[in-house]
A protein has these predicted regions:
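Amphipathic, small/basic residue-rich leader segments at the start of a protein or domain
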Residues: 7-16, 28-38, 48, 52-209, ...
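Flexible glycine/proline-rich, aromatic-decorated loop/lid segments
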Residues: 343, 351-352, 358-371, 475-493
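Charged, glycine-rich active-site and insertion segments that engage polyanionic ligands
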Residues: 448-480, 649-662
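C-terminal amphipathic alpha-helical interaction region
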Residues: 551-822
Length: 822
């Protein structure tokens, strides 16, 4: 009996080991067969027990006979799968197939290949790119007066617009042969981060021509004639671009786009040509009020078949329309939350343009949606994440300094535990954002077009940016609330919802896009199964489906085993690519990767097309994927920066908070999974020991707060590219100066309290009075008194807020300008 039990344990262990190692069906069958033969000859146990084992084993032998397997099993599953497969529109298919699969694909495997991520080169600026950031970018930041822009003008000054155009800020993605800067994605991102730390309005103005728009589309799809004519003009700022997709009825839903273009004959520049008569209504279009070249998405029809062929509905098409084309109405402005970057509606009635206005010419008619989704991912990885990161870096930079200089109860407010917790949270989230931005743009420079990470970055960086803005307001209080020239938080806080809403609203991105696109695009077998199901050649389709199906089954079993073993052992036997203080985070990501992949497969198998409608389940699985992706970016960023030990509290807080979120979202997914018996099985495999992963410990809060509230390499790395130059209008530079003065003054203040206040020699309640009395009592020297007065003056300059004559605040008032004029 004992021997039989030992053999059962050995057999079970071998099965688990083969599943964990992802042995092929043939290899697993062979190994188990050899063991069974040995057991049958030499093992103990009754004959019926051995017969049972062979009865369980022989079907696996038959599964290796592919024609038989296809006939008996795959054929039936194939028919069921085709019925379950949800209908997919052309726009959905093009969106799913857009871009490339990168690290996101590894996280779907249940056993990510860390070498793929860790071997990638750390992104670096070239000498030319660094010179641009230190030169023109620095100068642009110095020119910016955000209060003047947002309150007085509701626009950028002409000299700022001219500088942006002349220095090539709108030409960062345009190759040098067309007169552009041809910057890397990483450099492009760093430029935006720096500008965003100074002004969200100016950053929004800079990013649009470098994101999805005429220049990007021309580079990839334009004809040579279009490129040679338009790209140099765009690079020099002679043409100002905008792109119109969003409309009042359907938002950005291209499948329901009501804007139309009808192919017909018409007069263009004095000649009768075949062209397109456009009717459209767009809104929320950045740069539209001043744009000279309007990129336009519309549905193209050819009822008279003037383009040749039998097709009358060509689908979504993109064309470039000059501003002054008859029928175009443009110039009015929207006013997005006191962030007065140029944004407004574009309308067109019976606008006639030649067929050559189509990007890429007539041969690319109907390819507009493919163009947009293929190029959207790059812009979504750069523009909004960089703006959010720049704003967050500025908020952390100022909040750390402000919390050091603002005192309550004779101590800096940043020393209170509650404030420490908020500052630590802000800093860790900023570290996550910067890591994701840096590593992902590096991947783009390596040739990737990561469509799923684009959604992850867009959603999570803007959401973290919103949280950081709220936290900065909480810590700085009235300083952030009272608007005026001295307020460096208010306008950025007001503009936060803009980034939440644009380029795919965050609710939509979380509930539909991240997991919905990733489950098909990144899964190693789902897309292959879908393609097989839609293959008109039935024999080939069944053969491909059979191969994908059985790989998928083995994949699911392996991930179930990996998830169970990882959970039981607390990830301790999971292989990690690194030793040292970050090793455990790699192990936990591997464990959650297996759990996520297993849960994904069970959900898709049991719910089928219904999963598409269960948006909350999809959102939670997307959160798990996002948490693993962002934690991976944190670890890679830490490696890229040389593994500085002083940054470990930030890394620990970031990874722990992300992996805790992954655990909690998996838990929430299981609680709400509609097939309850399957949920119970999944819970037993994913959480056999319960919820064992903890959120960041409170002990990290003071360590991180100290890093942020003191000058040092960790603070400098975290807030790299923040515009901090010490000049009268840059309050981030001024608050940094005040912080340094406060730190230098602390020993002197302490001496006054100990030797003066406590002994009764100093009785004044305010610092200026205490300085006078302490100097008179000989507690401090004259030089120390001068030092303290300078420190107090600088601190009060920061702490003080603006007040106004009531007439200055009346809408449209010129009172302030009259005062300035004398």
């Amino acid at each position: 009996m004992v021997l039989t039990v030992l053999w059962v344990l050995l057999l079970t262990s071998l099965v688990l080991w083969l599943a964990y190692q992802r042995a092929s069906l043939a290899k697993a069958t062979l190994v188990l067969g050899v063991l069974l033969v040995y057991y049958s000859w030499f093992g103990g146990g009754p004959l019926w027990w051995k017969a049972t084992l062979w009865a369980l084993y022989l079907p696996h032998v038959l599964l290796n006979i592919r024609p038989l397997r296809r006939f008996l099993i795959s054929n039936r599953f194939f028919r069921i799968y085709k019925r379950m497969l949800p209908p997919m529109s052309r726009t959905e298919r093009e969106a799913l197939e857009a871009g490339t699969v990168w690290w996101d694909g590894e996280l779907f495997t249940g056993g990510p290949d860390w070498n793929k991520l860790l071997s990638a080169k750390a992104p670096k600026l070239t000498a030319e790119e660094q010179a641009f950031i230190d030169g023109p970018c620095e100068e642009l930041c110095r020119m910016i007066d955000d209060w003047d822009i947002t309150h007085r003008r509701a626009d950028l000054p002409p000299e700022v617009f001219d500088f942006i155009k002349k220095k090539g800020f709108w030409a960062m993605i345009i190759p040098k042969k067309y007169g552009g800067l041809e910057f890397s994605a990483y450099a492009h991102s760093c430029v935006v981060v720096k500008i965003a730390s100074r002004s969200g309005t100016v950053a929004s103005t800079v990013v649009v021509p470098n994101s999805l728009g005429p220049a990007e589309l021309l580079l990839h799809y334009g004809t040579e004639e279009q490129k040679n004519h338009l790209l140099p003009r765009l690079a020099r700022g002679e043409e100002i671009p905008c792109f119109g997709l969003t409309g009042p009825r359907v938002g950005s839903d291209a499948s329901a786009l009501p804007d139309t273009g009808v192919v017909c004959r018409g007069i263009y520049q004095g000649r009768e040509v075949t062209g397109i008569r456009l009717n459209f209504s767009k809104r929320y279009i950045t740069l539209a009020p001043i744009a000279t070249l309007i990129g336009l998405a519309f549905r193209l029809y050819d009822p008279d078949k003037l383009m040749g062929g039998e097709q009358t509905d060509h689908g979504i098409t993109v064309a470039l329309v000059p501003r002054h084309t008859p029928g175009v109405t443009v110039g009015r402005r929207h006013f997005p939350l006191n962030g007065p970057f140029q944004n407004g509606p574009v309308h067109g009635k019976d606008v006639f343009v030649p067929l050559d206005a189509i990007v890429g010419g007539p041969k690319l008619a109907g390819q507009g949606w493919r163009m947009l989704v293929e190029q959207l991912s790059v812009g979504r990885c750069i523009s909004l994440p960089s703006i959010a990161t720049g704003g967050s870096k500025g908020a952390v930079y100022s909040t750390g300094a402000y919390a050091r200089i603002r005192r309550q109860f004779n101590m800096p407010v940043g020393k209170f535990e509650g404030v420490e917790a908020v500052i630590a949270r802000m800093a860790a989230r900023t570290y996550i954002m910067d890591a994701a931005r840096s590593v992902t743009t590096g991947a783009i420079d390596g040739g990737e077009k990561p469509s799923v990470p684009a959604g992850i970055l867009k959603y999570h960086t803007t959401e973290m940016g919103r949280m950081i803005a709220n936290d900065a307001m909480d810590v700085q209080g009235g300083k952030g609330i009272m608007l005026g020239p001295k307020n460096y938080l208010g306008r950025g806080y007001q503009m936060v919802p803009v980034s939440i809403t644009v380029e795919g609203a965050n609710i939509l991105t979380r509930s539909l896009i991240i997991f919905g696109q990733g489950a098909v695009r990144c899964h190693p077998w789902v897309l292959k199964e879908m393609n097989a199901a839609q293959d008109p050649d039935r024999q080939r389709a069944l053969r491909d489906f059979d191969d994908a199906l059985f790989h998928h089954i083995g994949f699911t079993i392996s991930n179930a085993v990996r998830s169970l073993i990882g959970a039981v052992t607390l990830s301790r036997i999971v292989r990690a690519p690194m030793s040292g203080p970050t090793k455990r985070y790699y192990e936990h990501i591997n464990r959650f990767s297996a759990s996520f992949a297993f849960a994904t497969d069970v959900a898709m198998l049991s719910l089928g097309g219904y999963l598409k409608k269960k948006e909350n389940l999809s959102a939670r699985l997307g959160d798990v994927l996002s948490a693993m992706y962002l934690a991976s970016m944190v670890l890679k960023h830490y490696e890229n920066q040389g593994r500085p030990e002083v940054d470990l509290p930030l890394v620990e807080y970031a990874c722990r908070s992300l992996l805790y979120q992954a655990q909690e979202q998996l838990h929430s997914f299981l609680r709400n999974f509609p097939v309850r018996w399957l949920a119970a099985i999944m819970r037993a495999i994913i959480f056999p020991r319960g919820l064992t992963y903890s959120a960041p410990s409170d002990r990290l809060n003071p360590r991180i707060a100290e890093l942020v509230m003191n000058p040092g390499e960790a603070r400098e790395r975290l807030c790299h590219y923040v515009y901090r130059t010490l000049e009268p209008k840059n309050h981030l530079g001024l608050v940094e100066q005040a912080m340094r003065l406060a730190i230098a003054a602390e020993p002197i203040e302490k001496r006054i309290r100990v030797e003066g206040v406590k002994t009764g020699l100093v009785t004044a309640l305010d610092l200026p009075g205490q300085i006078r009395e302490a100097q008179a009592a000989g507690i401090i020297s004259e030089a120390e008194a001068v030092q303290l007065r300078e420190y107090d003056r600088r601190v009060m300059d920061i702490i003080n807020v603006d007040d106004f004559d009531p007439r200055e605040l009346v809408a449209g008032s010129t009172y302030e300008i009259q005062l300035d004029g004398g």
